[in-house]
Structure formats: C-alpha cells, structure tokens
C-alpha cells in the first residue's frame, strides 16, 4: 500500500496491497480518522499536523481489515441505461433511448427521452440532471430561505466526493447533483438543512429547530440519506 502526502511525496507500507490512501493534514485535528471516499473509492486518512509517518502507517495497518472489508462492500458503479427506472426530483421516470430524436434530453410525463448515440446516454442524462437541478434546487432553496428571513447569494450544483451540500459564511450554497435521484422528502430535508445554515453556521439546538420549522419530516429524510446515500454514489 502506498500513502500519498499532500506534498506529493509517497512512502510505502510494508505489506503492499496495491492501493493508494489519500492523506489529509488538518491543523485542527488531534487524532487520526479513517473513512472511504465514496466517489473515488479510496481510503482517506485525516491526520494531525505533526503526525509522524510511523504513526500513520501503524494506524493504517491496524485498520487494514476494515479498509478491505469496506471497499469490498461498495456497490458497483452504475451507468444510466436505456429502460432504467430512476427517481428524478421525486418522480419515478424511465430512461428511454431514442437515437433518432432531435430533443437532446427531455422529460415526457414519466419518460426521460434521450437522443443520440448509446455511448453518450450516461453523460447526457447526467448533464440534464445537473442542469435541471440548478432550477429545481434554486426555487426550493429560495422559498425556504424567505421563510426564515434570509437571502441566498449563490447556488451551485457540484460533483462532490462525499458531501451532499454545504453553505458558506457568504451565503453560498452547494448541492451534490446526485441528491436529485433521492425521494422528494430527502431533497426537502437537504434543502432545509443547508438553508438553515444561513442563520446558524453550526449544528446547535437552534439550528435543528430551524430545520424542523422548514421541514417537519426532516428526520425521515436524514435517516434515508444516512442509510442509502452510498447507493447514490454508484452513479459517477
């Protein structure tokens, strides 16, 4: 196994297993934390600023069984395909490939019509979802923000590695495009969560009360995301 530092330097672990581990150095961290990057499908190790190589290597070796077991359990990556049924902004639709159509990608009631060659279908569906999300997520977020007397500076749709959303101190909100594939109540929860950060840049009791005021079923949405979120990352 090879560990790659932020500096670009690498060093080998004794029992090489042919995979890379990303290392993130954090000045605010006092302990080592290991997790799996769902998008890149690699282990990520967060270490304190002055962590030694030996300590990092020992920690990885001690958790080797967990790393291999967790990687093995990751679902296979998925491509959008003709005839596939997906949830799209809370509606069940069927992806329908029509090579000779001249529509690009369009939604026709419960069918998502995709034109062009089959080799472009996955990319076209993904691009459509991201473009549509800009409007759908913007409208819902602005509506929720108005309810708590806040304004959003900017909303962006991202292809993030692990986060479903984020809200900066400048009132800029980012959303992961994959959340469009979740049930509507999950989308509602995430929007309420990030919009609440406009008022509370923490996860205090006041923050969760704000979330609850915007979405009474927020716990249902959060539970679904915690349990099923990894499945959404099979789409890349």
Task: Give each language-model segment a name.
Residues 194:
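Walker B catalytic acidic pair
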Residues 191:
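Walker B beta-strand of ABC/ABC-like P-loop ATPase nucleotide-binding domains
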Residues 1-188, 198-236:
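Active-site-proximal or metal-binding-adjacent scaffold patches in catalytic folds
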């Amino acid at each position: 196994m090879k560990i790659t530092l932020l500096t670009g330097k690498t060093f080998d672990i004794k029992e090489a297993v042919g995979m890379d581990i990303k290392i993130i150095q954090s000045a605010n961290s006092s302990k080592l934390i290991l997790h799996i990057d769902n998008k890149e499908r690699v282990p990520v190790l967060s270490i304190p600023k002055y962590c030694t190589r030996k300590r990092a290597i020992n920690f990885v070796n001690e958790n080797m069984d967990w790393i291999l077991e967790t990687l093995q359990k990751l679902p296979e990556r998925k491509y959008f395909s003709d005839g596939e049924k997906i949830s799209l902004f809370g509606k069940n639709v069927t992806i329908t490939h029509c090579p000779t159509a001249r529509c690009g990608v369009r939604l026709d009631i419960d069918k998502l019509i995709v034109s062009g060659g089959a080799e472009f279908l996955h990319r076209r569906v993904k691009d459509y979802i991201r473009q549509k999300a800009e409007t759908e997520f913007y409208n819902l977020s602005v509506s929720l923000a108005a309810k708590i007397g806040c304004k959003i500076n900017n909303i962006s749709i991202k292809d993030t590695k692990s986060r479903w959303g984020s809200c900066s101190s400048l009132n800029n909100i980012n959303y992961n495009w994959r959340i469009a594939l979740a049930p509507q109540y999950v989308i509602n929860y995430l929007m309420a969560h990030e919009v609440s950060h406009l008022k509370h840049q923490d996860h205090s009791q006041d923050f969760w009360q704000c979330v609850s005021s915007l979405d009474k079923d927020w716990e249902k949405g959060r539970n679904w995301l915690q349990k099923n979120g990894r499945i959404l990352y099979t789409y890349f």
